[in-house]
From Swiss-Prot:
GO terms for biological process: cardiolipin biosynthetic process; response to phosphatidylethanolamine; response to thyroxine. GO terms for molecular function: cardiolipin synthase (CMP-forming). The gene is Crls1. This is Cardiolipin synthase (CMP-forming). Catalyzes the synthesis of cardiolipin (CL) (diphosphatidylglycerol) by specifically transferring a phosphatidyl group from CDP-diacylglycerol to phosphatidylglycerol (PG). CL is a key phospholipid in mitochondrial membranes and plays important roles in maintaining the functional integrity and dynamics of mitochondria under both optimal and stress conditions. The chain crosses the membrane at residues 109-129, 133-153, 190-212, 250-270, 271-289. Pfam families: CDP-OH_P_transf. It is found in: Mitochondrion inner membrane. It is a multi-pass membrane protein. It comes from Rattus norvegicus. GO terms for cellular component: mitochondrial inner membrane; mitochondrial membrane; mitochondrion.
């Protein structure tokens, strides 16, 4: 009986110690305040499960919740001088600063527009294979509009710019261009060697992006952290000739789509555009080979 009373008293003291001042653990009350914030995506959920002690630790009095993707919330208070410094040390929260400060919100308007462009790519490929070039021209114009909008929004609104967007925007362009060139080559509107050159360059660039992601990821490197879109490690900056090359490639796509509609598939100007596209593609590949390291900006503190 005495042992039971001692155990009950110790449990009551422990509950009071972890309870914020003035809070009562009633039904649906401050218990919810002690829970960690909800994960915004599957990547955050997987990373939080890997770091369970940090994700499910109780918040200390005087601190506010910190969302993983936006990095919002106030930092922990500075430890007081003297004997209280050890009690207020950051290690009491079980949170790794490098893990929480690396997160950003991936759900921005430019990123959604880039994903929309990726979704339109197979639709365009199907329309070209079905030789429905009139509708394909309209869908291609819509895809081009999303490309213009995401760049305009990211440049003019700072909260819409993200490290993920710096990689997702060119990736969407490469997916769209690759599917369009393969489909147009199948329809005998673009020569095979030109398509092979463009696809080879894009495959090498995509492989380089995955390699940069691996190299800039802090240890320990895990699959959950690698494929987490909220975890930003580097920003990619395309070269000037690469931007020119993308514009020339899209002009060739538009001209090739319109060729069957306006009956100029055998025009000499279209063949000149083939040569210009081949030149800019080769020059773009060389620019990335020569200035490769300058196109990658590693985010500080990662």
């Amino acid at each position: 009986m005495l042992a039971w009373r001692v155990a009950r008293g110790a449990w009551g003291s422990l509950r009071v110690a972890v309870r914020p001042p003035g809070a009562r653990l009633g039904r649906g009350g401050s218990r919810r305040a002690l829970l960690p914030p909800a994960a915004c995506c599957l990547g955050c959920l997987a990373e939080r499960w890997r770091l369970r002690p940090a994700a499910f630790a109780l918040r200390l009095p005087g601190t506010s919740p910190r969302t993983h993707c936006s990095g919002a919330g106030k930092a922990a208070p500075e430890p007081a001088a003297g004997g209280d410094a050890a009690a207020q040390a950051p290690s009491a929260r079980w949170v790794r600063a490098s893990a929480t400060s690396s997160y950003e919100n991936p759900w921005t308007i430019p990123n959604l527009l880039s994903m929309t462009r990726i979704g339109l790519a197979p639709v365009l490929g199907y329309l070209i294979l079905e030789e429905d070039f009139n509708v394909a021209l309209g869908v291609f114009a819509l895809a081009g509009l999303t490309d213009l909008l995401d760049g305009f929004i990211a440049r003019n609104w700072a909260n819409q710019k993200s490290a993920l967007g710096s990689a997702l925007d060119p990736l969407a362009d490469k997916v769209l261009i690759s599917i369009l060139y393969i489909s147009l080559t199948y329809a005998d509107l673009i020569p095979v060697p030109l398509t092979y050159m463009i696809i080879s360059r894009d495959v090498m660039l995509i492989a380089a992006v995955f390699y940069v992601r691996y190299r800039t990821l802090p240890t320990p490197r895990t699959l959950a952290k690698y494929f987490n879109p909220c975890y930003a490690t580097a920003r990619l900056k395309p070269t000037f000739i690469s931007k020119v090359n993308t514009a020339v490639q899209l002009i060739l796509v538009a001209a090739s789509l319109a060729a069957p509609v306006f009956n100029y598939a055998d025009s000499i100007y279209l063949q000149i555009l083939w040569c210009c596209t081949a030149f800019t593609t080769a020059a773009s590949a060389y620019s990335y080979y020569h200035y490769g390291r300058k196109t990658v900006q590693v985010i500080k503190g990662k």
